[in-house]
Amino acid sequence: MKIKTILTPVTCALLISFSAHAANADNYKNVINRTGAPQYMKDYDYDDHQRFNPFFDLGAWHGHLLPDGPNTMGGFPGVALLTEEYINFMASNFDRLTVWQDGKKVDFTLEAYSIPGALVQKLTAKDVQVEMTLRFATPRTSLLETKITSNKPLDLVWDGELLEKLEAKEGKPLSDKTIAGEYPDYQRKISATRDGLKVTFGKVRATWDLLTSGESEYQVHKSLPVQTEINGNRFTSKAHINGSTTLYTTYSHLLTAQEVSKEQMQIRDILARPAFYLTASQQRWEEYLKKGLTNPDATPEQTRVAVKAIETLNGNWRSPGGAVKFNTVTPSVTGRWFSGNQTWPWDTWKQAFAMAHFNPDIAKENIRAVFSWQIQPGDSVRPQDVGFVPDLIAWNLSPERGGDGGNWNERNTKPSLAAWSVMEVYNVTQDKTWVAEMYPKLVAYHDWWLRNRDHNGNGVPEYGATRDKAHNTESGEMLFTVKKGDKEETQSGLNNYARVVEKGQYDSLEIPAQVAASWESGRDDAAVFGFIDKEQLDKYVANGGKRSDWTVKFAENRSQDGTLLGYSLLQESVDQASYMYSDNHYLAEMATILGKPEEAKRYRQLAQQLADYINTCMFDPTTQFYYDVRIEDKPLANGCAGKPIVERGKGPEGWSPLFNGAATQANADAVVKVMLDPKEFNTFVPLGTAALTNPAFGADIYWRGRVWVDQFWFGLKGMERYGYRDDALKLADTFFRHAKGLTADGPIQENYNPLTGAQQGAPNFSWSAAHLYMLYNDFFRKQ
């Protein structure tokens, strides 16, 4: 049934007025603090992430900061270079402008600020004014417009110097190492060119720090003639003007010889018609804000956070590079392990869901990037994994695929929320060709889960690990390491593992497949997968618990011909079952759109079977919460694989059936009561990743305490879905008030401390931004 909405002229005028105001980037100055002057290549914060927030846009591979005071005014400090998979600063000052009149340096006052899509500096003196606006013109080149107003001749001087010091944490040096000493092959060299200069870089293949091709360059081109002098790692460029002048400068980070060659024509075109590129950037950002800021019910504070989210997601957008042939979005451009074009499926589903509303083309591209490496029949590395989506793709392939990358990961995949994300893109764009493009990929992904991760064949997949050198011997025996005292021994085989567990003569076990299974859930080292600190386990045992409660078991998954496919944890996860419930529903929707009624019917039946199983088997009536279920040797009389794993405590997986709509109303009522209990999840910042009563809870533990915005949002939407919107709004208000830095100019964080609200994890974090945008765009609208 279609409902026609008739708007009165007054209503239309109000909406148009709101939209026009919202789309004006000038209304959102300094939403994120972009000032800074790095003194080290790795200028880290307390958690080893780059501690400044450079401006990136248009998928670029370099970023700029605003000056932090008189010493850096006139330039855009800390050129941040994305060296394939890592962010590293190149300079503190580079191409910093000073102005001289009658042989004296002009003493300016500085106003510097960011707006969505640009960095702006205004330098003011009695007889001279300079206005500088920096925007991105292409995915490899930024463009600076410098307007100089003066009635007298001026001498212009630009200078810069490459960084020498290697590393610091919170501004304090970690060592006295130099960049040249640590990376002798880096061989940074400044050279003058016809219209500017360039920095060339030698080839470095430091797997975990710095990756360069030996062909990369940072180029500076100017629209007026300059004379450049170079002294080692320093340069000075000079020009003379007779009065008021507007000049243009391009900055390009080019990672390969092919990019260097290809971009030159673009640079010439940018300098030939700079106004076109500046206007295009401005209009592009106006369009993002116009599309993205459509909630007239949101408070100014909520809207400002939404703008911060839009800036964050667009800043983490990377254009194609290396093995990733599509535009993509990374978790955090400033994150130690999340930069370059490193792309995860779990992050992608959420990023694309949000970006569909303001940057739908990149939302599509991000999803395409993930599926571009979906395993096809006859794959040379893992032919047994047809339909599988790798956990992490990046610039460099793994050694198994002919590259030298260390981050590329095929040990696991991520939860199946792909169809949820694809459908949101369709709901926004109404693009049926998009559904037709993605449907067969999603079906293959869905089928992989049931073929390679459903050990007991009951349609409820488990989390697990692929067949991989990290998990098993060449003959297919699962690897594990036994630790006792100061000794450790690596063994293999499930039978050996069972004997070791039964004897109990160990302090701890390290099992790569267990780690991969937790990664596969998207909740690394969560309590439900048997992760607990030694002190916590000792306390648990002292209080009457058993160590074996936290011991996980595994099963080999094999094809009909006996081929090892991989491993499953011998437990069925309630969150993955709930995601698969949604997956079936969305596949049914897509099948209907594409005129495939029989397939739609089959997926709806699968969804109902999952819902019945979740409510019959995974809800514990005693503790009134959902849990994972152990897979016993034989199913229980009620058809369940086993009993709920109550002893590992409550976690956000327990509200996944609510978010996905699989819960019964009665069970949802009970779960919400737990969520609202101050002794469980209703903490200073609510809905953390373990309840206060969980034996493995720690406020600072990554997935056993900290509040992650995705799980928080899943909880709110689940509550809303089952009639608890008012309670959910109170939790949302608490989050906004207590999550530190959120409504100020700090970056959006990876997670937050549930007891103090302290910022934790990586800054400029995409999926946090995505869910904060969703709160603004959907949840904070009046019903």
Curated annotation (Swiss-Prot):
Keyword flag Nucleus: no
Keyword set, alphabetical order: Calcium, Glycosidase, Hydrolase, Metal-binding, Signal
Leader sequence residues: 1-22
GO terms classed as biological process: DNA damage response; oligosaccharide catabolic process; trehalose catabolic process
Ranges for region N-terminal domain: 24-254
Active site: D524 (proton donor), E750 (proton acceptor)
Pfam family, one: MGH1-like_GH
Region ranges (Linker): 254-299
GO molecular function, one term: glucosidase activity
Region: A domain, residue numbers: 300-783
Calcium keyword on record: yes
Chain positions recorded as Ca(2+) binding sites: D454, N456, N458, V460, E462, E572
EC id: 3.2.1.-
GO cellular component, one term: glucosidase complex
Function field: Glucoside hydrolase that cleaves the alpha-1,3-glucosidic linkage in nigerose. Has very low activity towards maltooligosaccharides, soluble starch, nigerotriose, kojibiose and trehalose.
Similarity comment: Belongs to the glycosyl hydrolase 63 family.
UniProt protein name: Glucosidase YgjK
Gene this chain is encoded by: ygjK
